[in-house]
From Swiss-Prot:
Its cofactor is [4Fe-4S] cluster. It holds the Pfam family ThiC_Rad_SAM. HAMAP family: ThiC (MF_00089). GO terms for cellular component: cytosol. [4Fe-4S] cluster binds at residues 409, 412, 416. It comes from Clostridium botulinum (strain 657 / Type Ba4). Zn(2+) binds at residues 269, 333. Pathway: Cofactor biosynthesis; thiamine diphosphate biosynthesis. This is Phosphomethylpyrimidine synthase.
Amino acid sequence: MNYTTQMDAAKKGIVTKEMEIVAKKENMDVKDLMELISKGKVAIPANKNHKSLDPEGIGQGLRTKINVNLGISKDCYNIDMELEKVQKAIDMKAEAIMDLSCFGKTEEFRKRLIDMSPAIIGTVPIYDAVGFYDKELKDITSEEFLKVAEKHAENGADFLTIHVGMNRKTAATFKKNPRRMNIVSRGGSLLYAWMELNNKENPFYERFDELLDICEKYDVTLSLGDACRPGCIEDSTDASQIEELIALGELTKRAWERNVQVIIEGPGHMTLDEIETNMKIEKKLCHGAPFYVLGPIVTDIAPGYDHITSAIGGAIAATHGADFLCYVTPAEHLRLPNLDDMKEGIIASKIAAHAADLAKGVKGARDLDNAMAKARRDLDWERMFELSIDEEKARRYREESKAKSKDSCTMCGKMCAVRNMNRVTEGKDLNMLRDDD
């Protein structure tokens, strides 16, 4: 190959096979896509070692993508169950899967995940460090942290979430500006703790050029984590969050100089009125890099329903610039999600993403809704099911209701507006009282 990364190829005017696939999916000219990649406005996470990957683009002008989190924990160490979740995510066409395993030796699961998955795979190397070395966090060296990141890249992870912006300056800002919920990012809290316990700079910030060496070698996209994302609505858009975002913007430019693709991770918990502003701030400070948000979750009082609170926030965020939504399940803040929780989270995120694509005017987004409108006017139930985000549920609800007429449902029966308008415009009687049709 005459290039090292997708960004390097784009800058050189080389069209890669990944670009061709993404351009076709997005119904856009591949040269336009290449231009966006060269400027960092779009990323195609595509590790050279992820052979089963069906690439997707994330960023400006493209369909909003969703990510599914899964992985092994100490309380739920069940590789087979997590692999079932992987298959569920693939079957439901999630564009990305993150392995957030945080206990024991995780490489076996990670390698199986990457081998079987056509979806983009992301990981968080710091979660793996304690188990990888069987060491307490404070005893892990900066060099060892980098080695774990390289192992994940070697395994085939398409993007690595690294909380590089939690440096000493950001930490000092956090200390001066107390929060109601402190730091709620798992990776961010681990790095902050390591820095405090060792009185040292963030190893990934201090050795950022070495991290870029790894990303360039394997064509790994760097997902710059938001250690200071707000964990409750009271902490949103505060000094720590903005200080870190400024640092991420500076790191983004350094990565691009090395032809390493970047995604910026974002909030978090915030009220509806702050979402648009946050999207604009990120795009400004981080130079238009793709934005990957968790939610945002728009109220703190709905445990068991946070797939809804996050879908509300996600739809608004993606309408105003977010490019990539991390799903949230009903189990958020309560437990590790099961398969049913996963499905609910994926559906909610897909609804949010599609609603935003409609609002943004993404090419082809309205085609599905227009097709559904036609199917409904035609009372073509089979076509309605096929077009549904959750075909199984739509079909089951219809079958369980046992409607007396094929033209209507149990809500309106023969008073169905669609049925009656069809009949009267065709010159037919409504037959409201007879059961024969």
